[in-house]
């Protein structure tokens, strides 16, 4: 391709809208163009990158026996209502674009396709003889992000590969899940990316197990906690660990004490000369279910720990049926205004105890009249602890569960921290890294098939629900994440496997007929050898061309400059900036060798 004929415009300054390096560089280098908030045009160079990523994904999926398909982007609300996710996606999380057609039928623009594919399987899969099946697609998805940011990282429109598998039993599901795990590792390696597979929360997708694939980058939105022995890695939302040991309490007698002005852990510990690990603090939450009911929640947790709201949301979702609901649509720490709406009288905030009476809740048919009481293991194991007395300026010391307070249901709700000990080996401590979630695989189990009545006939003639898995990769996110992982002050450094072109031939002086002729010959020879090559034949200064070549990140640059008089050209490797002068006749072989060494 000749740059003189390409729609190719670069920018010298960083666009004001861009926050992270990869977003700045993709805009500056002419890969993408912003159309609206979270919506981008993929320009010719970017489209080549996306096609390459898609092809690697396609090849690895096909190698597992998965079958490519294409599902509708417009999805009827009825399917999502069957699964119970319509309210979650259109109201609670609010991430689905929804609309009414001219017959006033509700539709959604698909952020994901579990419901559609389950409906297809329900209609077409009848017998165990048809199982297992694994179907995938690569297409545009939509999410109504509250705050689109970081370019293609968190957009409202994006390209994704999603696959869905169907099985007769859980063992078959596990086998496909393992195959997808390996396929994803192959994909990211072939794309030339550094990544880490981590345990993950299943979120609104649901299911019994899931794993994320994180592309390591300082600008990653996700925090990963891992051990140096390589045996544990998890998203902080999912991570578990052993916290620091609690210091033994000096309070051996249960008594109420006046503790004026101690409504924080720090002030309380200073007043009592105690350690935060000896304190049980109460954290108030309120949850709203999809049936409109508000549930007051009282969490007891050790004083030096914090509540992981993802873990709490998951626990509430598991308990939703106990309150006549299907899901949680909001979880918040109530502020003063919110408390006025459901408390019978002002609460002694900062002095709450585990036995805060249910009578503190106002009588209202939309409010569940009893606290959901949960205790984190860090607090459940404490003895002779300090906690609130449910009275302003008073605490109790020397308290014990069951003796002084009923012990609530014990649930892991704490946020794991850097420096915590690992559960698999207490000599290992958790370290932290930032990552960009680029892939996610789930064992969905029976969640969707049971909800939507997708069954098959077993070998014994009985009707059973299908076991399901789903497996996603953000194709457009992978492309930008590659830039976030590999760039320098001069521009992008593409991995060779997904670079839009593998080589660029630069003519420093377009009026020099010898330079032009040599460049044309090299360009033709490289192209004939199957090397994807750009020819920079623009009428621009040499310095502009060199800066643009660095900016757009083509792996190998060939310059037909002054060395031509000796029958040689300069070749530059973008990643290392290593430059050498070689014979014109050696260019094709040299570039071929570099490409072969770079591509896994």
From Swiss-Prot:
Entry's EC annotation: 6.1.1.15
Domain of life of the source: Bacteria
Gene3D superfamilies the record matches: Anticodon-binding domain (3.40.50.800), Bira Bifunctional Protein, Domain 2 (3.30.930.10)
Protein's cellular compartments: Cytoplasm
Catalytic activities: tRNA(Pro) + L-proline + ATP = L-prolyl-tRNA(Pro) + AMP + diphosphate
One MF annotation (Gene Ontology) recorded for this entry: ATP binding
UniProt keyword annotations, A-Z: Aminoacyl-tRNA synthetase, ATP-binding, Cytoplasm, Ligase, Nucleotide-binding, Protein biosynthesis
Sections of the chain in a coiled coil: none
GO biological process: prolyl-tRNA aminoacylation
PROSITE patterns: AA_TRNA_LIGASE_II
GO cellular component, one term: cytosol
Cited SUPFAM superfamilies: Class II aaRS ABD-related, Class II aaRS and biotin synthetases, YbaK/ProRS associated domain
Task performed by this protein: Catalyzes the attachment of proline to tRNA(Pro) in a two-step reaction: proline is first activated by ATP to form Pro-AMP and then transferred to the acceptor end of tRNA(Pro). As ProRS can inadvertently accommodate and process non-cognate amino acids such as alanine and cysteine, to avoid such errors it has two additional distinct editing activities against alanine. One activity is designated as 'pretransfer' editing and involves the tRNA(Pro)-independent hydrolysis of activated Ala-AMP.
Similarity annotation: Belongs to the class-II aminoacyl-tRNA synthetase family. ProS type 1 subfamily.
Subunit structure: Homodimer.
Domain remark from Swiss-Prot or TrEMBL: Consists of three domains: the N-terminal catalytic domain, the editing domain and the C-terminal anticodon-binding domain.
Protein name: Proline--tRNA ligase
Organism the protein comes from: Synechococcus elongatus (strain ATCC 33912 / PCC 7942 / FACHB-805) (Anacystis nidulans R2)
Source lineage: Bacteria, Bacillati, Cyanobacteriota, Cyanophyceae, Synechococcales
